[in-house]
């Protein structure tokens, strides 16, 4: 039966689940159900066999945001708030803050974490949430077309859809790295790469920024004792690009602090093009971070770095997407590059939330991969978690994780301990070789993905990750942001690096004989015999 124009406003009963062999029974009469993603253009087949999409299209003068407002159903009763992280025995057990409060640290100076009303969410079985999230995939219905906001109840449940700032981020590709696993990793047959860099600004930072900028958009429309005039961040490149794009979409001023000459030109041009105020500072990321924290304490500028835990709520949806893409089966390993270390905790939050609410029955083991030139977490791990020391990060091709004093160190430790996780490092040569080798099997990886891949090579060599282990490598950014490092590698223009997988272009005279000589040689290298037929 064709859907009606008001289908989005309908509540729906819990559907029978294909995921559970023993469906749970409970009283749902008092519950308000979240909505499936349907819109006025949804429709089935007409009696004549033609579709009815045109008949049920929204009015021409109405956009998808206005359509969502018109068809909005009753509000659900889910909520979230800030709590100190991690909870301490000597802290105030009642300390919590509204998400509408502009606050970044607890009274003791520690981090904050977004906590959800898990009791309210748990009133619905895991099968319900699986079916709900699956029903929203591939839609343009506002705001559920986003991979983040399709899981709105797990992200920012209280925000009005009209306040959401989305560029339809997420829903990124999870692809089977068949040849890399088979030929270069000892016959791994279940190796996957989660392409978080295939997003609006080319990195996973979009997932967190849509959540943060949406909340800022909400706050700017509310009566505040201290208005928010803009949003600011320190960045190694990708955060500034994401913040600038989302602020531009919402008409909110963006201010970014960048370490001079330490990010790629592709990363630099993104905030410039999106109209942000860009400050180039003669310091490293950690120096930029100290300055932005001082500035946001004095000026009405909202802090957008991962010190602000709102971003992690969006980033955790990548973990839920992985579960969806495996039909709610849990991988054995997930390998994540780590710099400021918020992302590994975000992945843990996503997996653990799904486990706690019954969507899955376990969480994967996590691996955090660091560049050896910026490896404070690796050193802490190797000390048995007994001696953390920040450091001055050395230059690395994986510039986005060139961080020596990570804000989210405590978060990362919690995630790794809870998942029996591992920390591994990669030298500059190891990460560049891993990147090049992956590219030769069909990828176009960024250097940070190269760090994660190099960690995978090491863990396979050590026998820690098995041949048949389902393993996901998280690719955090698009390779096109880091082309100079690839150019230098294939030109063999990197000091003290062999560049063993370099594939430089071949200069050839523009005549048939010269071209044929080169191709004969190359094809012989490939083990190919060519036959030249002369007529």
Spans of features found by a protein language model:
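PLP-dependent amino-acid enzyme catalytic core
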Residues: 2-535
């Amino acid at each position: 039966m064709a859907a009606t124009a008001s289908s989005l406003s309908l509540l729906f009963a819990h559907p029978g689940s294909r995921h559970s062999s023993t469906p749970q029974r409970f009283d749902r009469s008092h519950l308000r159900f979240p909505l499936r993603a349907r819109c006025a253009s949804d429709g089935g087949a007409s009696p004549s066999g033609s579709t009815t999409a045109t008949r049920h299209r929204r009015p021409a003068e109405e956009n998808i945001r206005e359509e969502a407002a018109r068809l909005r159903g009753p509000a659900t009763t889910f909520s979230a708030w800030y709590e100190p992280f991690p909870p301490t025995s000597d802290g105030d057990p009642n300390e919590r803050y509204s998400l509408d409060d502009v606050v970044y640290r607890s009274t003791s100076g520690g981090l904050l974490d977004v906590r959800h009303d898990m009791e309210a969410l748990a009133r619905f079985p895991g099968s319900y949430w699986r079916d709900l999230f699956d029903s929203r995939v591939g839609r343009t219905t506002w705001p559920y077309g986003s991979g983040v906001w399709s899981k709105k109840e797990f992200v920012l449940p209280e925000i009005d859809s009209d306040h959401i700032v989305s560029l339809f981020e997420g829903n990124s590709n999870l692809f089977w790295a068949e040849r890399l696993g088979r030929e270069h990793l000892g016959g791994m047959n279940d190796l996957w790469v989660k392409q978080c860099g295939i997003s609006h600004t080319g990195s996973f930072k979009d997932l967190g920024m849509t959540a943060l900028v949406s909340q800022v958009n909400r706050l700017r429309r509310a009566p505040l004792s201290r208005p928010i005039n803009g949003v600011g961040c320190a960045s190694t490149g990708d955060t500034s690009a994401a913040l600038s794009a989302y602020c531009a979409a919402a008409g909110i001023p963006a201010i970014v602090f960048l370490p001079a000459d330490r990010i790629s030109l592709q990363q630099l041009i993104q905030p410039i093009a999106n109209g942000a105020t860009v400050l180039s500072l003669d310091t490293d990321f950690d120096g930029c971070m100290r300055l932005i924290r001082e500035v946001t304490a004095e000026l009405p500028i909202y802090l957008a770095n991962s010190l602000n835990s709102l971003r992690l709520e969006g980033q955790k949806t990548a973990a839920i997407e992985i579960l969806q893409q495996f039909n709610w089966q849990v991988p054995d390993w997930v390998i994540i590059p780590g710099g400021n270390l918020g992302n590994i905790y975000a992945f843990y939050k996503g997996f653990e939330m799904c486990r706690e609410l019954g969507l899955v029955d376990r969480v994967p083991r996590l691996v955090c991969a660091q560049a050896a030139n910026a490896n404070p977490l690796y050193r802490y791990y190797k000390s048995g978690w007994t001696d953390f020391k920040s450091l001055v990060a050395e230059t690395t091709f994986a510039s986005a994780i060139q961080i020596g004093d990570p804000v989210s160190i405590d978060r990362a430790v919690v995630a790794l301990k809870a998942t029996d996780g591992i920390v591994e490092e990669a030298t500059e040569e190891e990460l560049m070789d891993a990147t090049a080798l992956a590219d030769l099997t069909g990828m176009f990886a960024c250097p940070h993905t190269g760090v994660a891949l190099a960690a995978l090579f090491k863990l396979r060599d050590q026998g820690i990750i098995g041949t048949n282990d389902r393993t996901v490598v998280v690719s955090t950014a698009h390779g096109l942001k880091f082309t100079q490092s690839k150019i230098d590698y294939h030109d063999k223009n990197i000091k003290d690096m062999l560049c063993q997988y370099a594939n430089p272009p071949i200069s050839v005279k523009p005549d048939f004989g010269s071209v044929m000589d080169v191709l004969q040689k190359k094809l012989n290298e490939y083990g190919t015999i060519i036959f030249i037929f002369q007529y």
